[in-house]
UniProtKB/Swiss-Prot annotation:
Residues 424-446 are annotated as: Disordered. Gene3D superfamilies: Gamma-tubulin complex, C-terminal domain. Component of the gamma-tubulin ring complex (gTuRC) consisting of TUBGCP2, TUBGCP3, TUBGCP4, TUBGCP5 and TUBGCP6 and gamma-tubulin TUBG1 or TUBG2. TUBGCP2, TUBGCP3, TUBGCP4, TUBGCP5 and TUBGCP6 assemble in a 5:5:2:1:1 stoichiometry; each is associated with a gamma-tubulin, thereby arranging 14 gamma-tubulins in a helical manner. Gamma-tubulin at the first position is blocked by TUBGCP3 at the last position, allowing 13 protafilaments to grow into a microtubule. It comes from the Eukaryota. Its main location: cytoplasm. GO terms for cellular component: centrosome; microtubule; recycling endosome; spindle pole. It is found in: Cytoplasm, Cytoskeleton, Microtubule organizing center, Centrosome. PANTHER family: GAMMA TUBULIN COMPLEX PROTEIN, GAMMA-TUBULIN COMPLEX COMPONENT 4. One of its GO terms (molecular function) is gamma-tubulin binding. This is Gamma-tubulin complex component 4. The gene is Tubgcp4. Pfam families: GCP_C_terminal, GCP_N_terminal.
Length: 667
């Protein structure tokens, strides 16, 4: 019977020890000569046999299942367990069962040498597994019932290995070490060669962007501000502007990758995973382009063998050490970041590219855009058509020649764009839409060419990892805003020129109202322009250049640039809808005023006087609203940018003494 017991414990039940799929291994009830206490001891041993049989079934089923799946990946929706992490778990589980198998062999030798040994000896010899097997079975059952997949297996095993039972902890740490072997192989391929070897989608890095887009945030409708102040959400936006998505690292021409945070093991922090993501993306970007480049070497400075050896050393460690792991990742990341810094700052002239961005997107070349506004003024007053874009670019080239900007390498990279009513429909007809566009929501056709004007810039490799399409789109938003302010300023200056031409003629009360309103409008717009150019653009740009020159790390540059762009959008109030809406209303009133003056060079008739009265009231109301918004926030010390704009507008307390209202006087 002892041999029958050893066979049953090895996974081969017989007539004495029977197997039932539901209840497992049990002593047969057909033996009356067995004492109840003996039956109890034997059934206790049978629980070990039950667990062992289920372990071996699990190993055979899923190891074989994985091998079959290599050539036939599972269809989505099948939901079966599969993957190389599962196979590694089975391998580790098999190694943990080896001492149990050896104990049975030793018992067999002992019984052959001494036939008088009792069942109690078997019970004593196998007692060490009575704690181990149920604990490991909990892990196996959890993997099966919850269909745990990929790196989630690491998390499950790790959590159960944190218990206080030494044999259980030791066994699960062995299994975890085998599973980590798979992770280190994937890490080596990703970090050293830019290869994502992940057929079953098990790794914590995936191809494709993460869910959620910034455009949804930017276009989210919020309730407008009451006169009293700002909403809590708007204040949070001001205090915590994180506008650049970390995952938008690569241009669409290259594969995009992102973190799959939901399966990242808890003992690997997200900050370390982001470093791993950055290294792999950078290596892949460099490898993809290296074929076309004459430069020799690699982004890892030919240290692949050294780093591979360090990762292999980590793989050989019986216990995972986050300190050692992060040190190796940091060394690889530092090498990559320094190489990228050299590539971008020294070889690709990043500072020169930023100067181009500032000159064109941020209107640094003011004389160019002044000439362009004069040239294209009449062309863009009407709603755009299919030929407007071509005409505008011709005007832009002519303006560049007028101001002696004849850089043959630069101008072809810049292109003014016009979004006219039929453009999206044509694009839809010619190409399938893969990604929901920002323009899918029905919008009104632009009222003028100015409203539809944008700027595009062809970014050269490798600067595309810094100036992504999402980043350039944000620059475009700033460009449109700055151009609208500059255009209003130019129109008000033109009105002043008209006023000077007629100053020798007799004027009436309406003329006094008209020119005083122009003076107040120019005062507000000039100070807004000064605030944007000096307090925002020049200040932030000089900080950006200082940060770039004080580091040799690409990630630091990228974060500094992200911060720069975030500050531009925040400090120019593009994201603070109450202020932005109020400023736009003021600019629209200025446009209307300039149109009225240009069309009525002489004294205003009754209809013109009525229009002027409406403009005076509107400007008075909007300037009052702006003053109240700026004052309410300033009093709470929440936003220094609003306080700075108020300082520019109210530097001599005229605004305050006028009751926070400009342009309000009797007709």
């Amino acid at each position: 019977m002892i041999h029958e017991l050893l066979l049953a414990l090895s996974g081969y039940p017989g007539s004495i020890f029977t197997w039932n799929k539901r209840s497992g291994l049990q002593v047969s009830q057909d033996f009356p000569f067995l004492h109840p206490s003996e039956t109890s001891v034997l059934n206790r041993l049978c629980r070990l046999g039950t667990d062992y049989i289920r372990f071996t079934e699990f190993i055979e089923q899923y190891t074989g299942h994985v091998q079959q799946q290599d050539h036939h990946p599972p269809q989505q929706g099948q939901g079966g367990l599969h993957g190389i992490y599962l196979r590694a778990f089975c391998t580790g589980l098999d190694s943990v069962l080896q001492p149990y198998r050896q104990a049975l062999l030793d018992l067999e030798q002992e019984f052959l040498a001494d036939p008088h040994l009792s069942i109690s000896h078997v019970n004593y010899s196998l007692d060490q597994f009575q704690l181990l097997f149920p604990s490991v079975m909990v892990v196996v059952e959890q993997i099966k019932s919850q269909k745990i997949h990929g790196c989630q297996i690491l998390e499950t095993v790790y959590k159960h290995s944190c218990g206080g039972l030494p044999p259980v902890r030791s066994a699960l740490e062995k299994i975890l070490a085998v599973c980590h072997g798979v992770m280190y192989k994937q890490l080596s391929a990703w970090m050293l060669h830019g290869l994502l070897l992940d057929q079953h989608e098990e790794f914590f890095i995936k191809q494709g962007p993460s869910s959620g887009t910034l455009s949804a945030q930017l276009e989210e409708d919020e309730e407008d501000l009451g006169i009293g102040g700002l909403t809590g959400k708007q204040l949070r936006e001001l205090q915590d502007l994180r506008l650049i998505e970390e995952e938008n690292m690569l241009a669409p021409s290259l594969k995009q990758f992102s973190l799959r945070v939901e399966i990242l093991p808890s003992y690997i922090p997200v900050r370390v995973a982001e470093k791993i993501l950055f290294v792999g993306e950078s290596v892949q970007m460099f490898e993809n382009q290296n074929v076309n480049l004459t430069r020799k070497g690699s982004i890892l400075k030919n240290q692949e063998d050294t780093f591979a050896a360090e990762l292999h050393r980590l793989k050989q460690q019986p216990l995972f050490s986050l300190v050692d792991f992060e040190q190796v990742v940091d060394r690889i990341r530092s090498t990559v970041a320094e190489h990228l810094w050299k590539l971008m700052v020294e070889e690709s002239d990043l500072l020169g590219q930023l100067k181009i961005i500032k000159d064109f997107y941020l209107l640094g070349r003011g004389e160019l855009f002044q000439a362009f506004i004069d040239t294209a003024q009449h062309m863009l007053k009407t709603p755009p058509t299919a030929v407007t874009e071509h005409d505008v670019n011709v005007a832009f080239q002519q303006s560049a020649h007028k101001v002696l900007l004849d850089d043959d390498n630069l101008l072809p990279l810049l292109h003014l764009t016009i979004e006219y009513h039929g453009k999206d429909h044509k694009a839809d007809a010619t190409q399938p839409r893969e990604v929901p566009s920002r323009e899918t929501s029905p919008r009104e056709a632009p009222s003028s060419g100015w409203a539809a004007l944008g700027l595009s810039y062809k970014v050269q490799w490798p600067l595309h990892i810094l100036f992504t399409p999402a980043v350039l789109e944000k620059y475009n938003v700033v460009f449109k805003y700055l151009l609208s302010v500059r255009r209003v300023q130019a129109e008000l200056q033109h009105c002043w020129a008209l006023q000077m031409q007629r100053k020798h003629l007799k004027s009436n009360q309406t003329d006094a109202v008209k020119w005083r309103l122009r003076n107040h409008m120019a005062f507000l717009v000039d100070n807004l322009q000064y605030y944007l150019q000096v307090d925002v653009l020049e200040s932030q740009f000089s900080q950006l250049l200082h940060q770039i020159n004080s580091t040799r790390d690409f990630e630091s540059i990228r974060l500094a640039h992200d911060h720069f762009l975030s500050n531009l959008l925040a400090q120019s109030f593009i994201l603070l809808k109450p202020v932005f809406h109020c400023l736009n209303e003021i600019l629209d009133l200025c446009h209307s005023f300039c149109s009225l003056v240009s069309q009525n060079l002489g004294p205003l008739d009754e209809r013109g006087a009525a229009q002027l009265s409406i403009l005076v009231k509107g400007f008075s109301r909007q300037s009052s609203l702006l003053f109240k918004i700026l004052s309410s926030v300033r009093n709470h010390q929440i936003n220094s940018d609003l306080a700075q704009l108020l300082l520019r507008l109210d530097y001599n307390k005229y605004y305050t003494q006028a009751g926070g209202t400009l342009g309000s006087f009797g007709m």
